UniProtKB/Swiss-Prot annotation:
It is a lipid-anchor. The gene is mltC. GO terms for biological process: cell wall macromolecule catabolic process; cell wall organization; peptidoglycan metabolic process. Gene3D superfamilies: 1.10.530.10. CDD domains: LT_MltC_MltE. It catalyses: Exolytic cleavage of the (1->4)-beta-glycosidic linkage between N-acetylmuramic acid (MurNAc) and N-acetylglucosamine (GlcNAc) residues in peptidoglycan, from either the reducing or the non-reducing ends of the peptidoglycan chains, with concomitant formation of a 1,6-anhydrobond in the MurNAc residue. This is Membrane-bound lytic murein transglycosylase C. Belongs to the transglycosylase Slt family. A lipid is attached at residue 17 (S-diacylglycerol cysteine).
Length: 359
């Protein structure tokens, strides 16, 4: 009964699905994959609701790691935005034992997203000698957690001192919550600085922009997935941005999921796409600040949608932008772009980039 939710149906789609991200290139197969993935994720959410109850659906996202085990009766949820780790179970027998096991595995898991299936209850989390959360969490004595002994002792402390329960219908949900260290975001970002610097030099893209995109897209969560199947730290989509980058590099096809879940490959691909937006798709914009605003917005909603804000003719759109001040371009994109998400995206990335430039 390992595949209690019949999620074996999802496995083939997980290999090839894509999303409506970051580009204007679409094809029929991509649309079918995206729609199919969305339908199956809706079914996944429905089945989780059947097991956990109304308003208890938690699914992995760009800034949320969620892993179910124990026939979907136990889950680990890392909220990378809020900096909290919540371990919960609805197991009817020995709930503390289920929680203890999940706490230890979550604290000691590695940083290889390609080895973990977030859409099944398979216990495929391996304990790592260099845990992904090392330094982002400290135990009750204020020490970082690297080894199983310390993780086990901390789990025992949590179960004794922080165990909570709540009722949802006939179900009792037991949980413990762990707060990450205040600078957990910086701790994660630091893991990838070398990769960011390498990609920055390779493609001529500012390090601060790459970091700001990563923060906004995934909060530096290497396990990041979206309901529309954008993948990894920079939320790259296989059949749009990924395909464009591969084509520009003389490669056929699209990057695989495992390729995009590799942090170095993801950062390289995402940065290559930023360079394409800057140098090719939006290269007709003269002012570098105006072009940066356009590139940021295009990374979220596509270059075509950015240019159409100014004119349906792409050349004319660039000419119009070139008559405007950078401030006017920013104001236009944050107020007139048809996508509310893209309007907010420019504000978020621009704000984050300023903070990285000050460091």
């Amino acid at each position: 009964m390992k595949k209690y939710l019949a999620l074996a149906l999802i496995a083939p789609l997980l290999i090839s699905c894509s999303t409506t991200q970051k580009g204007d290139t679409y094809n029929e197969a991509w649309v079918k994959d995206t729609n199919g993935f969305d339908i199956l994720m809706g079914q996944f959410a429905h089945n989780i609701e059947n097991i956990w109850g109304f308003k208890e659906v938690v699914i992995a996202g760009p800034k949320d790691y969620v892993k179910y085990t124990d026939q979907y009766q136990t889950r680990s949820h890392i909220n990378f935005d809020d900096g909290t780790i919540t371990i919960e179970t609805i197991a009817g027998t020995e709930p503390a034992a289920h929680l203890r096991r999940a706490i230890i595995k979550t604290l000691l898991m590695g940083d290889d997203p390609s080895s973990v299936d977030l859409y099944s209850d398979v216990d495929d989390i391996t304990i790592s000698k260099e845990p992904f959360l090392y330094g982002q969490v400290v135990d009750n004595t204020g020490q970082p957690i690297r080894w199983e002994g310390r993780a086990s002792n901390f789990a025992d402390y949590l179960l004794k001192n922080r165990l909570k329960s709540r009722s949802n219908g006939l179900r009792i949900i037991y949980s413990v919550t762990i707060n990450m260290v205040p600078n957990h975001l910086d701790k994660r970002a630091h893991k990838y600085l070398g990769m960011v610097r390498q990609a920055s030099r390779k493609y001529g893209v500012d390090e601060s922009l790459i970091l700001a995109i990563m923060q906004t897209e995934s909060s530096f969560n290497p396990y990041a997935v979206s309901r529309s199947d954008a993948l990894g730290l920079m939320q790259v989509v296989q059949h749009t941005a990924g395909k464009d980058v591969f084509r520009s590099q003389g490669k056929s096809g699209t990057p695989s999921r495992s390729f995009l879940f590799d942090p170095a490959s993801n950062i390289d691909t995402g940065t290559a796409y930023l360079a394409m937006l800057n140098n090719v798709y939006l290269g007709g914009i003269d002012n570098p600040t105006s072009r940066r605003y356009a590139v940021i917005t295009a990374y979220n909603g596509g270059a075509g949608s950015v240019l159409r804000v100014f004119s349906n003719d792409k050349i004319q759109a660039a000419n119009i932008i070139n008559t405007m001040t950078p401030g006017d371009v920013y104001q236009t994109l944050t107020t007139r772009h048809p996508s509310a998400e893209s309007r907010r995206y420019l504000y978020k990335v621009n704000t984050a980039q300023k903070s990285y430039r000050r460091r």
